Amino acid sequence: MIGEVIVVGDLKLRDSASVDEYDRLGERMYEIVSNLSGFQSVKSFKAEDGEEITIFRFASEEALELWRTHPEHVETMRRGHAEFYTSGFLQVCKVIREIGPFKHE
């Protein structure tokens, strides 16, 4: 939808990162974000080299701000930089044009 906010995270885990703890925190973050007003969806894709792309969709910048400033999310982001990620970046994008949805039979 026009005006939606899309956040793309491109992150790579450290070789020394605890995958079990990372997965546990990811599940907790999903519990939180999925209950916030304006959250629409999240999907993650992992490449063979360990790079992970995550795409969040929010109804508005205000909805994203609820997530960005949530205390548990803030602490998890801090831990991510300190314990889990070797590199990465986030992009925050606003939908300005949309084609579809469409379905081929």
Where are these regions (language model features)?
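Alpha-helical structural motif
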Residues: 25, 76-77
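C-terminal end-helix/capping segment
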Residues: 77, 81-85, 89
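Short S/T/G/P-rich N-terminal loop/turn motif that feeds into the first structured element of a domain
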Residues: 1-52, 61-69, 86-105
